[in-house]
Amino acid sequence: MKRLLLLAAASATALGVTAAKAEPLKIGIIESLSGAQTSTGRLYANAVEYGVNQINKAGGFNGEPVQVTEYDNAGGAPEAADKFRQAVADGVDIIFQGASSAIAGQLTEDVRKHNIRNPDSKVLFINLGGEAMELTGEKCQFYHFRFTTTAPMRVNALVNAMKAAGDLGTKVYSINQNYSWGQDMQKAVEDAADKGGYKIVGQVLHDVNKIQDFAPFVARIKAANPDTVFTGNWSNDLLLLMKATGDAGLDVTFATAFLDQPGNIANAGKTALGDYIANNYDNSATDGKFAEAYKSATGHYPVFVEGNSALALAQLQQALKTLDFRGGKIDVTKIALALEDSTYDSPVGPISVRKADHQTIRPVVVSKVVKNPKYPADGTDMGFQTVKIVPGDQAIYPVQSSCHMKRPKE
């Protein structure tokens, strides 16, 4: 089911009589809006809609309000491919997606092939959450932009911050989902072992969104007796892992990528205190202005993936301001080139785009679960407190040798 949103329609009046003649910029959200990943997919969609609303409040683009259509991929790559074809038929110019690297991998290939076959109606893919290394490696392509971190960026930030704080220990366990992202996380933990001064005492890759009870996995973790458990799990696989951890009263520090997903702190209970997360954004790392603006518009502070996703739209808005199609045809290639040249001063630091692979060079925020924070989570007295912000130029890694991007003729 799709939902067409003409956000901030009142802005159309301000655009005057030319609005009816102009070509609107069309955005498609191809997201997990049903199934096991809905809790994540809906937050991505919410953030995109918020960001588009901000663009429209400022006057829209190309003489029209920006249009947004939601497409439900139901958490699957084949469904995402079907929805991409539907989006193309609807004339979508830019697609957004975040929940699952597997789906992002499907979409970036769909976009690449479509653009080769249809040079006069290209589509741009802005990836909000697919963090698999291959997306800016062997699958890198000009019309894909990644507005999030990757496993090495998160793991290295965690290792450095936790070691400096004396919270890392010398024994580490790794539990991750068995697909591209989880495999990248496991490798990043292995690669950081020497620098972190720890030994890996156990690691496991498990099926994605199929485990209903993580108690056996928690028992294995307990038996290995680690100081820290690294996990890139997200959605139900993290919610259920945290529940099993809380139920078992497991006394171990978790180093995570997505602990701020709603429900995780409540599920883990007091065992969450002292756990870490490396993320794109944390309300506590900012002056609060963006968080308050988001709350004013949506009724809640940005949580989980909403912050960095909304900021990606703000960076797109900044890039669009440099373009003027005079109400005529939308040129996606020019939008991509404008994005390449953009640097956005986000609430946690500057975000730019590396032209060689379209990985954003962005700050990584390391936070720790504490009692009585400024922004409590899940209706508890616990939440996140920023420990360190790693600047983008320190967090980024070299372009992968497997990336051979073909650029358009300029």
Where on the chain are the PLM-derived regions?
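Extracytoplasmic "Venus flytrap"
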Residues: 28-49, 71-78, 99-100, 175-184, ...
